[in-house]
Amino acid sequence: ISCSLVGSEMCIRDRHHIHFASPPYTSLRAKLKVRDLARELVEYTGNCTLFVVPYTKPQEYIRDNAPDVLFTVLMRRSMLRIANQVAKKLELQALITGESIGQVASQTMQSLAVTNEVCELPVMRPLIAFDKQDIVDISLKIGTYETSVLPYEDCCTIFVAKHPVTKPNLNVIKCSERHLDDVIDEMMERAVSTAETIEVC
């Protein structure tokens, strides 16, 4: 299952995409933008399925109950857990993300290693060594650039930590997650069970 549409084009057989929606912080237009991007990839992937996961409750809970500097890493770990659960339900064998080294604080080697630790399935990162211009060039080539730059918010641009940790310690992260207790697990399970399925063709 793919968490990245450009990354999906690099792994051409992928036909399942996941989008994390956090209304009211993210709008219907943001969801439709992702649907439109998936449509633009149909030429390469064939018909595909988009899973829209309601992520507001887990995201708010992490924001309100974890240290601000750890918010980004904790959020991304929870997103990978959810993607892992969706993929396992569909009997898929891997996750695909669009991360590239050093583009943002959550994509340092240390952050990626700590994020990866929660995932049972392999995580493929076809854009890992690409810089921003490389990724822009790919999106221009496959015809998704104009849609991708539409200025609609996504769940990764809300509740942004002022000074996110760039070299997270796994033990510290796990300690913070224990303080989130079973509530966050229940929220993630509900997010998976109530995900909206959109067939894209």
Predicted regions and their residues:
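Short secondary-structure boundary segments
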Residues: S22, G98-E99, S148-P151
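Single conserved hydrophobic/aromatic residue that forms the stacking wall/gate
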Residues: I1-I12
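Cysteine-dependent PTP/DSP-like catalytic domain, specifically the C-terminal lobe
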Residues: R13-K57
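Active-site adenylate/phosphate-handling loop in enzymes that bind or generate adenylated species
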Residues: L41, Y55, Q59-D137, K141-I142, ...
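Extended, hydrophobic alpha-helical segments in both membrane/secreted and soluble proteins
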Residues: S2-S4, H17, V34, I135
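A glycine-rich phosphate-binding loop feature that marks nucleotide/adenosyl-phosphate handling sites
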Residues: V53-P58, S100-I101, E153-K162
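Peripheral terminal appendages
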Residues: E9, C48, L92, T108, ...
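Short hydrophobic alpha-helical runs that function as membrane-insertion/retention elements
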Residues: R15-I18, M124-R125, S148
